[in-house]
């Protein structure tokens, strides 16, 4: 039995459906399982719509083998082919990691807010004017509000978008 159920509620859609069609502006932008929609959103709308909070996005420029993310230089990971020009880097709050030390693949950030949600903590960080949400792993010590930290933005769950569509 095939059933088409229309909803604007992501939780409802992901709970009832084996396969979800996500539409925006009258166009289907991704069809897939809940896991596929969450892990590799094919469109920035899907990344924002699926998940709570939605995916973080950072304006990024790719030039040569380097990235400029909010004015900070980040080297493109080995083997990752990105189109030149303006991109968006997308990463979910669950996959961002906070460090006190600058490392490859990190961006400098300032902690603006720490929320204790009960089972986890949500940290809001400012990366050159763009606010990012970081969901801390259980038992992780939260940084203090005002602290300068580094966010690991490059990893296996990082997505890159050009013209709102997934390119890497």
Stretch-by-stretch model annotation:
Residues 14-17, 49:
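Hydrophobic Walker B segment
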Residues 22-23, 91:
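Catalytic metal- and UDP-sugar-binding loop of GT-A-like glycosyltransferases, i.e.
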Residues 25-27:
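Conserved ABC ATPase "signature" C-loop
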Residues 19, 31-32, 40:
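Short, glycine/charged-rich "phosphate-handling" switch motifs in NTP-dependent
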Residues 35-39, 47:
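Short acidic-hydrophobic catalytic motif
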Residues 53-57, 65-168:
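Non-catalytic connector elements of ABC transporters
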Residues 1-6, 9-15, 35-36:
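Conserved H-loop
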């Amino acid at each position: 039995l095939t059933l088409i159920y229309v909803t604007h509620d992501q939780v409802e859609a992901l709970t009832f459906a084996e396969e979800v069609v996500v539409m925006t502006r009258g166009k289907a932008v991704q069809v897939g399982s809940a896991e596929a929609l969450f892990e590799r959103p094919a469109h920035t709308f899907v990344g924002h719509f699926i998940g709570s909070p939605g995916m973080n996005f950072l304006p990024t420029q790719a030039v040569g083998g380097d990235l400029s993310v909010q004015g900070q230089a980040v080297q493109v990971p080995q083997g990752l082919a990105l189109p030149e020009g303006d991109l968006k880097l997308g990463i979910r709050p669950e996959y961002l990691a906070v460090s006190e030390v600058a490392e490859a693949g990190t961006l400098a950030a300032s902690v603006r807010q720490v929320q204790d949600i009960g089972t986890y903590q949500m940290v809001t960080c400012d990366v050159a004017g763009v606010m990012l949400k970081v969901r801390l792993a259980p038992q992780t010590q939260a940084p203090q509000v005002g602290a300068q930290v580094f966010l690991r933005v490059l990893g296996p769950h990082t997505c890159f978008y050009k013209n709102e569509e997934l390119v890497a």
